[in-house]
Amino acid sequence: MIDFRKKNIFELNVQKTFLFLLTIFIIKVISILNSPLSLSVDEAQYWDWSNNLDLGYFSKPPFIAWLIASTTYFFGITEWSIRLSAPIFHLLIAVMIWFISKSIYNIKVANFITLIWATLPLTSFGSLIISTDTPLLLFWCMSLFTLLKTLESNKIIWPILLGISIGLEL
């Protein structure tokens, strides 16, 4: 029998946090697979762009088209495959938030902030649709993390990665 006075089973640790993130990711992928929603106008436009890849489009950067082209190449042209990169990127955003929070604060705070991010209603909705904001937010988080590493380290790799992540935000 577990003595709850001695051990807090609800205390977060890194393994529980990442297991929770993985569980949320699986639920989001299942939700996309079973979603009755058709593509929004923007999603359909991005899918159209993915059929004619270019270095840029009139109103948006090209990364969203490249993402959709990669997922539809591997999984076929379906609504769920067009949206598949959204939960993947949101999982990566959560991981980056964990690393940023750990870098600024500590592991306990990082676990808590990451779980808050992963369970926000807007985050949950945003991970079910594909938009230009999803990769932008990931690369913004990567830029913040690499900036923190650049400021605390003399290694040349961090400024290079900072430049790459800022460039990918565009």
What are these regions (language model features)?
Residues 13-39:
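Transmembrane signal-anchor helices characteristic of membrane glycosylation enzymes that use polyprenol
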Residues 24, 113-121, 166, 170:
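Short helix- or helix-capping micro-motifs
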Residues 34-46, 55-67, 76-80:
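Extracytoplasmic catalytic/substrate-binding loops of multi-pass membrane glycan-assembly enzymes
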Residues 52, 158-170:
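Membrane-interface alpha helices of multi-pass inner-membrane proteins
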Residues 62-66, 76-92, 126-130:
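Loop-to-helix entry region of an early transmembrane alpha helix in multi-pass inner-membrane enzymes
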Residues 68-72, 85-96, 136-139:
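Transmembrane alpha-helices of multi-pass, membrane-embedded glycan-processing enzymes
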Residues 102-107, 143-158:
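Membrane-interface transmembrane helices that cradle and orient dolichyl/undecaprenyl
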Residues 122-136:
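Short acidic/glycine- and proline-prone juxtamembrane loop motifs at membrane-interface regions
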